[in-house]
Design a protein with these regions (language model features):
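PRPP-associated nucleotide enzymes
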Residues: 1-183
């Protein structure tokens, strides 16, 4: 069985700042940042804050993808919600950064890129990059790879906000605020 790694909110925030530094140090200066809801939203906020602190101004939003129906269970189709703003404002000279917490199968990013190409057509930015805190190459079913990542792993990651699917004992042992959750 693959070991479970329980991530703390502090660790995820620090790694999100590390991810922001990787983007900044590469010389890439996004004009638009998209945090992919759910897990990519807090990572995207931290990356955007760090880049702005370093003088990089960007438009930033969250969009949602959906395909998971349970732990390790996905529907064949990835659904995407909330692209309207991007479709309205993107231009070829823009630089787009897509951010998620984990690049697992790659299906969500692949579907998002296809939807952006289909809807933006000639206005799709020439530069589109993908950043993620965790990259799982052994689970990747696409020909894509994130441009920026902090950790490469095959472990089962339990993010700070995740409690569904955990046992009471796991929550007690690994979740800050377990008494609030289990009341």
């Amino acid at each position: 069985m693959v070991p479970k790694i329980y991530l703390s909110a502090d660790r995820l925030l620090e790694d999100s700042f590390r991810l922001g530094n990787l983007v900044f140090d590469s010389g890439f200066r996004p004009t638009h940042i998209v945090g992919i809801w759910r897990g990519g939203a807090p990572v995207g906020i931290a990356v955007q804050e760090l880049l702005e602190y370093r003088g990089v101004q960007s438009d930033h939003i969250a969009i949602r993808t959906a395909s998971y129906t349970g732990i390790d269970q996905q529907e064949p189709q990835v659904r995407i919600y909330g692209l309207g703003h991007l479709v309205d404002v993107l231009n070829p000279e823009d630089r787009l950064l897509l951010i998620d917490d984990v690049f697992d199968s790659g299906r969500s990013i692949r579907a998002l890129l296809k939807e952006l190409k289909d809807r933006c057509r000639n206005n799709l930015p020439d530069e589109v990059k993908v950043a993620t805190v965790y990259y799982k190459p052994s689970r990747n079913v696409t020909d894509l790879k994130p441009d920026f990542f902090v950790h490469q792993t095959n472990d089962w990651l339990i993010f700070p906000h995740e409690i569904n699917g955990l046992t009471t004992d796991e929550i007690r042992a690994h979740k800050h605020g377990a008494d609030i959750i289990l009341r």
